[in-house]
C-alpha cells in the first residue's frame, strides 16, 4: 500500500470527533509488529504504537484521526475521497489525515533507526481535548515512555508546501469582566449607573492593545474583545450590569497575573468582577534542537525551501507534549482549506511529506 492509498483509506473513515469509526483498529493492523498501548474514556480512543530498535532517542509522531463535522456546501461526498483536477477532496484531507498517513507510512518503511520510534494518535483533538493526547501522555509518563522528541503532523504550511514549521504556539487566556451598575429609567440617567457608558470610556484604550513587545519567536500578546452584552433589548431602561468577554493569545511574556493587573489599571475606579481561565499554555522549542534541524534539512532536500520557524496560529496538541518536557515541533501540508467545505490537498504534498518524515527517521542517528 503506497502512501496515497493509505491516505484515501484513512479519509474514508467517518471519524467525526470523538468517533474513530474503526480507524484505530486499521492503524494497529497496518503497523502490525509494533507494541500497542490503548486507552478509551468518555468515548475517546487513544492509540500509542511503538517499537524499540536500539538504545537511542525516542522519537514520536503525534496526530489525530478525528475531524470536524463536514457541514454544508460540499461538491463531493466528504467521506468518499475524490481525486480531480490535481487535488484529493475529503474532510480531513489537510487536517490532518494527510499528516497521519505520511508518518504511518514513514514509520512502516523507514530503515536504520536506532532508538524508539512511536506514534500517539487520538480521536479527540477537534473536540474538548480532555481525554485525548493530554490524558494519554499521563499514562505514558507512568510507564516511563514519554518521548524525547515529537513531530506533530498538523498542517503548518501557508503559501507553498515546506514554507513553515511550528516551533511553538501561543497560549490562550479567556476572560469575562462584569461591570456592575445600577439599573434605572432612561429618562433619569442621573439616578442610575449605566455600565455601558462607564465601559465605553475605557474600551478604546484596551481593545486591540499589545500587552508586551513579543520577541524573536512570538508576536506581542494582544487584548481582543470578543463579546459585550448588556440591557434587556428595550429603549427605556438602562442596564444594571454589563458583561465583556475577551481573549488573549499570550506568549511567554504575558500571564494571567499580568492581564489581571492590566484590567485593574483601567477599571480600578469601577465596581467589577473578573474571571480568567488559561485554556492553553504557550511554549517554544529552540530552533537549534535536533528535531528542528532534522526537519529543516529534510524539507530543504525535498522542496528546496528553507522553512520559516513560526509560532503563529491557534493551539494544538503539541502543547501537551511540551508540558512533559518533550522537544516538539509541528509540520504538515498547507492549511488553506482546513475546516472548510471542499477541504483538499494534493497527492504531491502527501508524497513529499511522507518522504520528509522517512528521511528524518533514517537520518536521525
Swiss-Prot record:
Its EC number is 3.5.1.18. Its cofactor is Zn(2+); Co(2+). Binds 2 Zn(2+) or Co(2+) ions per subunit. Zn(2+) 1 binds at residues 64, 95, 154. The active site is at residues 66, 125. Pathway: Amino-acid biosynthesis; L-lysine biosynthesis via DAP pathway; LL-2,6-diaminopimelate from (S)-tetrahydrodipicolinate (succinylase route): step 3/3. Zn(2+) 2 binds at residues 95, 126, 339. The keyword Disulfide bond does not apply. It catalyses: N-succinyl-(2S,6S)-2,6-diaminopimelate + H2O = (2S,6S)-2,6-diaminopimelate + succinate. Homodimer. HAMAP family: DapE. Catalyzes the hydrolysis of N-succinyl-L,L-diaminopimelic acid (SDAP), forming succinate and LL-2,6-diaminopimelate (DAP), an intermediate involved in the bacterial biosynthesis of lysine and meso-diaminopimelic acid, an essential component of bacterial cell walls. This is Succinyl-diaminopimelate desuccinylase. It comes from Nautilia profundicola (strain ATCC BAA-1463 / DSM 18972 / AmH). The gene is dapE.
Amino acid at each position: 500500500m503506497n502512501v496515497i492509498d493509505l491516505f484515501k483509506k484513512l479519509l474514508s473513515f467517518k471519524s467525526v470527533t470523538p468517533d474513530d469509526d474503526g480507524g484505530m483498529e486499521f492503524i494497529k493492523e497496518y503497523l502490525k509488529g509494533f507494541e500497542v498501548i490503548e486507552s478509551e474514556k468518555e468515548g475517546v480512543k487513544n492509540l500509542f504504537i511503538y517499537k524499540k530498535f536500539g538504545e537511542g532517542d525516542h522519537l514520536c509522531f503525534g496526530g489525530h484521526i478525528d475531524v470536524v463535522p463536514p457541514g454544508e456546501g460540499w461538491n463531493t461526498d466528504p467521506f468518499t475521497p475524490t481525486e480531480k483536477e490535481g487535488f484529493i477532496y475529503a474532510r480531513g484531507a489537510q487536517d490532518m489525515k494527510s499528516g497521519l498517513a505520511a508518518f504511518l507510512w514513514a514509520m512502516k518503511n523507514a530503515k536504520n533507526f536506532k532508538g524508539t520510534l512511536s506514534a500517539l494518535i487520538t480521536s479527540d483533538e477537534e473536540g474538548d481535548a480532555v481525554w485525548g493526547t493530554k490524558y494519554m501522555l499521563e499514562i505514558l509518563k507512568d510507564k516511563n515512555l514519554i518521548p524525547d522528541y515529537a513531530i506533530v503532523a498538523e498542517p503548518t504550511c501557508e503559501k507553498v508546501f515546506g514554507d513553515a514549521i511550528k516551533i511553538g504556539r501561543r497560549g490562550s487566556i479567556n476572560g469575562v469582566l462584569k461591570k456592575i451598575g445600577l439599573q434605572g429609567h432612561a429618562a433619569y440617567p442621573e439616578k442610575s449607573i449605566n455600565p455601558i457608558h462607564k465601559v465605553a470610556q475605557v474600551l478604546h484604550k484596551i481593545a486591540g492593545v499589545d500587552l508586551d513587545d513579543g520577541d524573536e519567536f512570538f508576536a506581542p500578546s494582544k487584548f481582543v474583545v470578543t463579546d459585550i452584552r448588556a440591557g434587556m433589548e428595550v429603549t427605556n431602561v438602562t442596564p444594571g450590569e454589563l458583561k465583556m468577554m475577551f481573549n488573549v493569545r499570550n506568549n511567554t511574556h504575558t500571564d494571567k497575573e499580568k492581564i489581571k493587573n492590566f484590567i485593574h489599571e483601567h477599571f480600578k475606579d469601577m465596581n467589577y468582577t473578573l474571571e480568567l481561565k488559561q485554556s492553553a499554555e504557550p511554549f517554544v522549542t529552540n530552533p537549534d534542537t535536533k528535531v528542528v534541524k532534522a526537519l529543516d534539512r529534510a524539507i530543504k532536500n525535498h522542496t528546496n525551501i528553507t522553512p520559516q520557524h513560526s509560532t503563529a496560529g491557534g493551539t494544538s496538541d503539541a502543547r501537551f507534549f511540551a508540558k512533559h518536557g518533550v522537544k516538539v515541533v509541528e509540520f504538515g501540508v498547507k492549511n488553506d482549506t482546513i475546516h472548510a467545505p471542499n477541504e483538499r490537498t494534493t497527492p504531491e504534498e502527501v508524497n513529499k511529506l511522507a518522504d520528509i518524515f522517512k528521511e528524518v527517521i533514517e537520518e536521525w542517528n
